[in-house]
UniProtKB/Swiss-Prot annotation:
Required for the maturation of SdpC to SDP. Not required for SdpC signal peptide cleavage, secretion from the cell or disulfide bond formation. InterPro entries: Sporulation_SdpA. The keyword GTP-binding does not apply. It comes from the Bacteria. The gene is sdpA. This is Sporulation-delaying protein SdpA. GO terms for cellular component: cytoplasm. Coiled coil: none annotated.
Length: 158
């Protein structure tokens, strides 16, 4: 009982301890599990992914990051998300199948983003960012269904 009390009371002190400026969390919150965020995320929410031609190092699986326990490797996706938030939604291009998306990726001109102190973990180079709603589980049995709506954006960090 005493251990439970100590664990729960430590969350009180987590509110008054200093924050990590990058994660906007303090040390105790970084050690705690994800919480209810996993359970409250809508399954129909758009998925965002990014790809690059450059040698982007995603160090989550490396031994020096304790095979993903340290969160430093996730910072690159957070910084890329900050960039995407500041880009006008009109710049996203839409494609409906893999062939049209491949052609669109080659034709899109990248939006230039100047690297500054807000984006220290991202390497300079071109990034392709995709937004797509997940395919409904109703369509899983239909293998011939190849159409989808994907939005594509290309940025170049200089």
């Amino acid at each position: 009982m005493t251990i439970c009390f100590l664990l729960f009371s430590s969350y009180y002190f987590s509110n008054i301890s200093p924050q990590n400026p990058l994660f906007k969390k303090n040390f105790l919150q970084q050690l705690s599990p994800q919480g209810f965020g996993f359970y409250s995320k809508s399954p129909t929410e758009e998925n965002i992914s990014f790809h690059t031609k450059e040698n982007l190092k995603l160090p989550n699986a490396l031994p020096n990051n304790f095979f993903g326990i340290k969160r430093e490797g996730r910072v690159q996706a957070i910084e890329l998300g900050k960039i995407v938030e500041n880009i006008d939604p009109k710049n996203w291009k839409t494609c409906e199948n893999n062939n049209s998306c491949t052609n669109l990726e080659k034709q899109i001109k990248p939006i230039k983003v100047i690297k500054n102190e807000d984006y220290i973990h991202l390497s300079k180079g071109e990034y392709l960012i995709y937004r797509q709603k997940p395919l409904s589980w109703y369509w899983i049995d239909f293998k011939q269904t190849t159409s989808f709506e994907r939005k594509v954006l290309k940025i170049k960090i200089v």
